[in-house]
Structure formats: structure tokens, C-alpha cells
Amino acid sequence: MLRTILDAPQRLLKEGRASRQLVLVVVFVALLLDNMLFTVVVPIVPTFLYDMEFKEVNSSLHLGHAGSSPHALASPAFSTIFSFFNNNTVAVEESVPSGIAWMNDTASTIPPPATEAISAHKNNCLQGTGFLEEEITRVGVLFASKAVMQLLVNPFVGPLTNRIGYHIPMFAGFVIMFLSTVMFAFSGTYTLLFVARTLQGIGSSFSSVAGLGMLASVYTDDHERGRAMGTALGGLALGLLVGAPFGSVMYEFVGKSAPFLILAFLALLDGALQLCILQPSKVSPESAKGTPLFMLLKDPYILVAAGSICFANMGVAILEPTLPIWMMQTMCSPKWQLGLAFLPASVSYLIGTNLFGVLANKMGRWLCSLIGMLVVGTSLLCVPLAHNIFGLIGPNAGLGLAIGMVDSSMMPIMGHLVDLRHTSVYGSVYAIADVAFCMGFAIGPSTGGAIVKAIGFPWLMVITGVINIVYAPLCYYLRSPPAKEEKLAILSQDCPMETRMYATQKPTKEFPLGEDSDEEPDHEE
């Protein structure tokens, strides 16, 4: 009896390691924490940099003038200082107690219009709109740094998982993510925030590629894989859902470090779960040699699916650095609203990934993705029409639902394309999927700020929306991608219903290939 009791934990642990559902839980939690950290900084960084740098520059300037000459305070003249954070000259009106600053690219002292200052005070807007316009580029680069680093690391993580399995890279991702979260909590400068964001990109690459590849390997049936991917992407959606509102509220009422310390604690729990379930010290390479990464990149069907993921997610990625600052300038929104603006998109994304994870397989994943990209484009065109936070609810909700349609359709398609046309080893193909996702989050924020400065926020939305609408018809090519003959033969035996929509022009009843049809593949190729 005593031995049975002592052996019970070990028996439960052994059963847990053999359970596909617990593997799904591990991946769900990893994606949840990754994307909570990904979005929790969205409302914090713009206002944090404003509080730290803009006000610091102006307060130090006024202290200097107060100590040097009493006559300077009474004078309504304007003086200039050199800003240490973006190499620009700042013109400051000395007679205004709050120190309103305007950014100029020259050393000349051009007086700002008095009406702007009066309007800012009446509407409780943040002062220094010029600073916000300059800051939008730096905020965009900071947000994009995570995706850029993930973009660089992914091509190495995919083949690595093929060699050593998914468990060790998954745990390595947790360790790096934990260090990044702690660094965010105690970073007080732009440089440290940039390093923490870059470190997060490395950890996210390990977690995302290994997690999705692991799911594809344990859920071999296409219907089950679609449901599992939808559930896992639900963790991603929940992270996006909770992250921005959680960050804005905690930053407003508790402080900058609080949300990151809470995430660090949750990451520790995830690490303990991985230690129990995944055995991260065990090297378990794939039994079959995977298709080389560059060979997968030559597959036009994989490229079409990757492009769909990239452009759809670019829609929300380009909003992250630009929408909060646009709201600060045009709506005079308080800090807590900057994160809540993304709440409709996150809720609808959570609904979309879970709903269309099942429906997409019935209606056709290519059609689901095509409709999703059209809705993404239309929603982005409607964003600039909003005059307050309530006007953003409809466009953002449509955007989130549509991206959920695209992601829940394209992620299973990537795995199924490998099953049909290549070797069923999934590390490299999900590295490509993650690269596509990261390209959207790298190109969007890094170029969004520059485009806003050049032609304005509304035109940025028009450009991104039109790109999605124009790309959408390409999803039609995923309707019936041809399979390699030998792959189709295997799939026809195992699950004939799965391959019906993917059959080539040749009737499937002639497969599997017999001796009489040896010449046919050469003819088909």
C-alpha cells in the first residue's frame, strides 16, 4: 500500500508525459506568456519615455534658467537646447511654467503658436506634440526589435529542432523569456528597454517554433491538428487580450515594474510545468530527415501561406506604436485608454481563432483566409474615421476577428502542405510561419513611424489596408495544392477523406502506385 502511494506521483507524471492534451497546455501557456509580454509594453513605453525624457529635459532647463537669471523667467522669449535623446534642437518657451517644448530641425528659435498651448491645457492633452511626433519612430524601432531578432534566429531554430527535438528549445525559450521579463521590470532607459525587447525576440523564437512543431508532430490527423492549433492560438490571443489593458492599468495605478514582475512569476510556473511534462534534458531527434529550409522556401504554396500570415498580422503590428500616439495627439486619451483601445481586437481574435479553428476546415481554409484578409483591409480603412475610443471598437474588433480567421487557417495549412509535398517534419515549416509572423511585426512598426511623419496616420492605414485587399485573392491558390505522388499514396491509405480536396488531376483510385504505373510519376513530374 505504501509503495503504491509513493509510486503514484511517478505514475501520474509518466501518464502526463504521454498525454497530448498536456503538451497542448504547455504550448498554450508558453504562447500566452510570450504574447502578454509582447503587448504589455504597448501602452507603457510611449508614456514612460514621455515621462522620463520629455519632462526631464524641460525640468532641467527651467532649473538652469532659474539659477542663472531672474530676468529670464519674466521674459517671454524662446531659447533652444540640444536634446540628448534624438539629436534635435528643442525650442522652449521660458514663461510657461509647465515647460511646453516644440521640436525643430534647425538651431533657429521659431516661436510656437500660443493657441496650441491653450488648446492642450483645455483638453488635458499631453504637452509637446512635437516630441510625440519624433518619438513615434523610436517607439516603432523598439517594438520592431523583437520581431527582427526573432526573424534572424528562426532559421537556426527550425533545423535545430529537427536535430535535437522540441523539448530542449522549448525550455531554452522559457529561460530567455524569464530573463527578458525581469530586465523589463528594472529598465529605466531606452537602451535597456531595447536590449530587453531584443532578448525577448530570441526566447520567443525558441518557444514559438518548438511549440507549434511539437503540436504538429503529436496531432497527426489534420482535423485534430486544426483544433489543436486553434486552441494554441487561443493562448496567443488571450495574451494579446490581457497584455495591453493589463499593462496600461497596472502602469497607471501601481507602477511600471508591477506587470513585468507578475509575468516573471507566471513564467516560473510555466517553467516548472515544462520540467514535469517535456523532459527538457532529453535529446529526441526526428526519426525522419526533414526537408531542407531552402527547399521549403522554394515551394510557392508555402510562400503564399506565409505571405498571408505576414500581411494580415502587419495590420495590427503597425497599429501598436502608432495608434497610442495618434490617440494622445487627436483624442487626448489618458494612459489607461491607450491599452484598452486594443481590447476589442484581442477579444475578437480570441473568438476568431477558436471558432474558425473548427469552421475553417469545413468552409475551406483558403476561403477563410481570403475573407479574413479582405476584412483586415476594410477594418484598417475605418480606423482613422474614429473621433474617440468608442469609434475604435468596431474597426479593431473586425481587425482581430479577421486576423484570427487567417492565423487559424494558415497555421494548419503550413503543416498540411509539408505532409502533402515534403517530409512530415515540422520544425522548419513552422520556423517559416514564425518568420512570416515576425516580418509583419518587424516591417510594420519600423516603417509605420516614418510613414506617419511623412504623410500622416490616415494614409498609413490606407496603404496597409489596400495591401491586404490586393493580396487576398492569392489565397485561392491554396484551394487545391498538388501533392507529390508518393505522399498522396500514403495519405490516401491513411486518411482518404483528408486528401480529397488536395488530389491531383489524376484520379486517386489509381493509388497506391503499383508496378504497372512506375512510369506515371516521371510523366507527371
From Swiss-Prot:
CDD domains named among the record's database cross-references: MFS_SLC18A1_2_VAT1_2
GO molecular function annotations of the record: monoamine transmembrane transporter activity; monoamine:proton antiporter activity; serotonin:sodium:chloride symporter activity; xenobiotic transmembrane transporter activity
Biased composition (Acidic residues): 513-525
Gene3D superfamilies: MFS general substrate transporter like domains
Gene Ontology biological process terms, A to Z: aminergic neurotransmitter loading into synaptic vesicle; dopamine uptake; monoamine transport; norepinephrine uptake; serotonin uptake
Keyword annotations of the record: Cytoplasmic vesicle, Endoplasmic reticulum, Glycoprotein, Membrane, Neurotransmitter transport, Synapse, Transmembrane, Transmembrane helix, Transport
Keyword Plastid: no
Gene Ontology CC entries for this record: clathrin-sculpted monoamine transport vesicle membrane; endoplasmic reticulum membrane; presynapse; secretory granule membrane; synaptic vesicle membrane; terminal bouton
Family statement: Belongs to the major facilitator superfamily. Vesicular transporter family.
Protein name per Swiss-Prot or TrEMBL: Chromaffin granule amine transporter
The species this protein was found in: Homo sapiens
